[in-house]
Amino acid sequence: MSNHPLLQCINLCKRYQEGQLHTDVLRNVSFAIEPGELMAIVGSSGSGKSTLLHLLGGLDSPTSGEVIYQGRSLNQLSSTAKAELRNRELGFIYQFHHLLPDFTALENVAMPLLIGGSKPAEAQEKAHEMLAAVGLEKRSKHRPSELSGGERQRVAIARSLVNNPSLVLADEPTGNLDQRNADSIFNLLGELNVRQGTAFLVVTHDLQLAKRMSRQLEMRDGQLQHHLTLVGAE
């Protein structure tokens, strides 16, 4: 096993400029994620959590600073290389599942594999395995409209893991769910972490759910606090 972090960000800054006005969304954010780690970043709306996740996933570029994933600087990668990295090595989960409405659960989960060049039969077999891993093997032929909110988010989790990523970035994955389903989703993330060794970085406003992760950080006004407080928690 490598002694290097799975992902590291160094002095990340993100500034949005409009004419003479500017907004500093992130200010000198630095931290690392270890292989197999369960980490939560807690913060209120507008604190910079989602912007940070976009930078870590190569969906946006920092104004300054650097993101290093498994020894590779995202700043040095082309757009094509970043897209390939996202497809093959990173998983993403969002507050809203973003499932394709005209496709079944199985087809939605298989989609990243097909985009990556897998044969249809192989993609379907792997998608079946992942749906079974999240407890939805009997719902594989259902479309999103035929699934509950919790089930749709489980499909989204299966889709994020189908390429066996080393790291999954989750942006408020339980924000659109009731407490029972939110608890179930967090339990599932923990189970998948143990079973598959996948690292998860979850950004959330829910302190109680975040405390169930192995490490918690707090985002305040674009800066990362390497401790967690009860201030502003819901």
Swiss-Prot record:
Its main location: membrane. Its EC number is 7.6.2.-. Signal peptide: none annotated. It is found in: Cell inner membrane. It is a peripheral membrane protein. Disulfide bonds: none annotated. One of its GO terms (biological process) is protein localization to outer membrane. Belongs to the ABC transporter superfamily. Lipoprotein translocase (TC 3.A.1.125) family. This is Lipoprotein-releasing system ATP-binding protein LolD. The lineage of its organism: Bacteria, Pseudomonadati, Pseudomonadota, Gammaproteobacteria, Enterobacterales.
